[in-house]
């Protein structure tokens, strides 16, 4: 990560930050109350401020940084695939840690949304659910990955259970991909939503990896139902019981 200004006490722009709270003024008929609350939260989010200082494209970069600081699953020289990569924050973190370069790229991301090019990162603009996507990812990387990352979440519909089920499906598809392409000893990190259905996925991961952790990094908003499943040390088929 780039050198940054000294982090205030309390974390990334946390309790030690004296930045004044910004309020969004209400004008009749211009903005809904829910939208105003979201905008105020965004404007006053310490991770949003820090991402601008550090040059990361999203606050989500700090989720990956915090999880890696704890579990050390990203290391120099690894090959990485990032699913649902837009706008590129996780790719930026991975590129920095593994030392990927334009001459020898070792990070490949994919998203159906366009992503502004990043140094040392190959970005595929296509839906990961497309039949050709898995092979295109491997072709772009040139080998099996050491780590598969997935921060995918389905576009929200406003119906909580529907959103939950759609994102759970993406988790399962990402896991199937990871199990089919990871090197022996590789790692898999996936975003899931708390709700019960992730237990089936958890069972599958425990059968195929040495250890599996539930992780809620500090950068994940307290009110969010998201959590991350981190599966470490993939067992080759001959090792799976």
Curated annotation (Swiss-Prot):
Question: Which residues hold S-adenosyl-L-methionine?
Answer: 88, 90, 111, 127, 151
Keywords of this entry? Cytoplasm, Methyltransferase, rRNA processing, S-adenosyl-L-methionine, Transferase
Provide the active-site residues from the annotation: 191 (proton acceptor)
Give EC number(s), comma-separated.
2.1.1.166
Q: What is the protein's major site of localization?
A: cytoplasm
| Its job | Specifically methylates the uridine in position 2552 of 23S rRNA at the 2'-O position of the ribose in the fully assembled 50S ribosomal subunit.
Q: Which InterPro entries does the UniProt record give? A: RNA_methyltr_RlmE, RNA_MeTrfase_FtsJ_dom, rRNA-MeTfrase_E, SAM-dependent_MTases_sf
Which reaction(s) does the protein catalyse, per the Swiss-Prot or TrEMBL entry? Answer: uridine(2552) in 23S rRNA + S-adenosyl-L-methionine = 2'-O-methyluridine(2552) in 23S rRNA + S-adenosyl-L-homocysteine + H(+)
Q: What class does this enzyme belong to in the EC scheme?
A: transferase
In the record, the note on similarity to other proteins reads: Belongs to the class I-like SAM-binding methyltransferase superfamily. RNA methyltransferase RlmE family.
Task: Extract the HAMAP family matched here.
Answer: RNA_methyltr_E (MF_01547)
- Give the UniProt entry's GO cellular component terms: cytoplasm
What is the organism of origin for this protein? Answer: Bartonella quintana (strain Toulouse)
Tell where it localizes: Cytoplasm
Q: What is this protein called?
A: Ribosomal RNA large subunit methyltransferase E
What Gene Ontology terms describe what this protein does at the molecular function level?
rRNA (uridine-2'-O-)-methyltransferase activity
């Amino acid at each position: 990560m780039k050198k940054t200004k000294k982090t205030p006490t309390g974390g990334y722009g946390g309790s030690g930050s004296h930045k004044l709270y910004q309020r969004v003024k209400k004008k009749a008929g211009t903005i809904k109350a829910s939208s105003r609350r979201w905008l105020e939260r965004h404007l006053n989010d310490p991770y949003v401020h820090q991402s601008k200082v550090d040059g990361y494209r999203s606050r989500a970069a700090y989720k990956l940084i915090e999880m890696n600081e704890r579990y050390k699953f990203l290391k120099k020289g690894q090959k990485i695939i990032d699913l649902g990569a837009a706008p590129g924050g996780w790719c930026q973190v991975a590129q920095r840690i593994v030392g990927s370069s334009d001459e020898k790229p070792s990070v490949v991301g994919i998203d159906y949304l366009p992503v502004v090019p990043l140094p040392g990162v190959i970005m595929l603009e296509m839906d990961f659910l497309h039949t050709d996507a898995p092979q295109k990812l491997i072709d772009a990387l040139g080998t099996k990955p050491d780590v598969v990352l997935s921060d995918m979440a389905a576009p929200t519909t406003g119906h909580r259970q529907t959103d939950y089920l759609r994102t759970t499906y993406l988790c399962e598809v990402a896991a199937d991909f990871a199990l089919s392409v990871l090197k022996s000893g590789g790692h898999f990190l996936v975003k899931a939503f708390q709700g019960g259905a992730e237990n089936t996925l958890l069972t599958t991961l425990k059968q195929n990896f040495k250890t599996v952790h539930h992780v809620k990094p500090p950068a994940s908003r307290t009110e969010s139902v998201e959590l991350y499943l981190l599966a470490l040390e993939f067992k080759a088929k001959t090792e799976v019981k």
